[in-house]
UniProtKB/Swiss-Prot annotation:
GO terms for cellular component: cytoplasm. The gene is coaA. One of its GO terms (biological process) is coenzyme A biosynthetic process. NCBIfam families: panK_bact. SUPFAM superfamilies: P-loop containing nucleoside triphosphate hydrolases. Pathway: Cofactor biosynthesis; coenzyme A biosynthesis; CoA from (R)-pantothenate: step 1/5. This is Pantothenate kinase. It is found in: Cytoplasm. It catalyses: (R)-pantothenate + ATP = (R)-4'-phosphopantothenate + ADP + H(+). Keywords: ATP-binding, Coenzyme A biosynthesis, Cytoplasm, Kinase, Nucleotide-binding, Transferase.
Amino acid sequence: MKNEMNYYEISREEWRYFHGRGEKYTAITDDELQQVSGLNDRISLTDVSDIYVPLRHLLQMKYEQFRENQIKQSEFLEIKPHKTPFIIGIAGSVAVGKSTTARLLQLLLSRVYPDKTVQMITTDGFLYSTSELKQKGILDKKGFPESYDMPQLISFLNAVKNNVAPVKAPKYSHQIYDIIPDEFDIIDDPDILIVEGINVLQLPTTEQIYVSDFFDFSVYVDANPSLIEKWFLERFDLLLDLAKDDPTNYYYPYAISDRASAFKMARRVWRDIDLRNLNDYILPTRNRADLILHKTKHHLIDKVFLRKY
């Protein structure tokens, strides 16, 4: 274990032993793992036991501390304890595997807390719709800070944190590459909420309250940009395969066109939009996370950085 300035750097070999010996753990199956895995994200049951079970154990500790602190504060104020959800933020680049991490943690925490409600949302639902982005003249900056309705996202999190149930979160579809009109995810009195998105650790200058102010723990999924580009293009290839027989799919025109031309467009999107967004707005938030999962080739997590204080 290396002792960095703000983080403990822990190798995979060391981290795998921090799983909470003797604690009840309900194993997940290969089929369940495939259901939570994102497109082109490679993960195995070994990854679950080596990386995610210790992380689940850490989150259990944090959650129990959080609940105890809530009770003590209520006693201090001489008020009835108010149920407040424990919120976990998960950040990182596009195509790095945030969604897989979020869904897997939701599954693991649901297993260890079968009597608790563990829900998850993605901040993609708080992007402005394509029509709104066009009106604002920022369609080419989709994913950048200005493309999100941050007041709506902050209002949503404030309602969740104050246990104003149920709360609606807009739904986003990668199939149509837009907000789904009149469809919502309902967040109803969760004990634990996982919020996943590229922007969850950002500090917009236009806001006085930040998304991360509502988090009780945060995770950043990290990898070398050259690897993320590779995963981005591999995912794009899979999206084209899935879209080739569906004219309603956003990727259908690219799927039925010349594949080389489609990839030329995808590389341009990565270079001009996603890489720039990563370097300018996402990567600078990495050191605000409580824990960093560092990935190497084939999505293998080789080390973990845990914030000291």
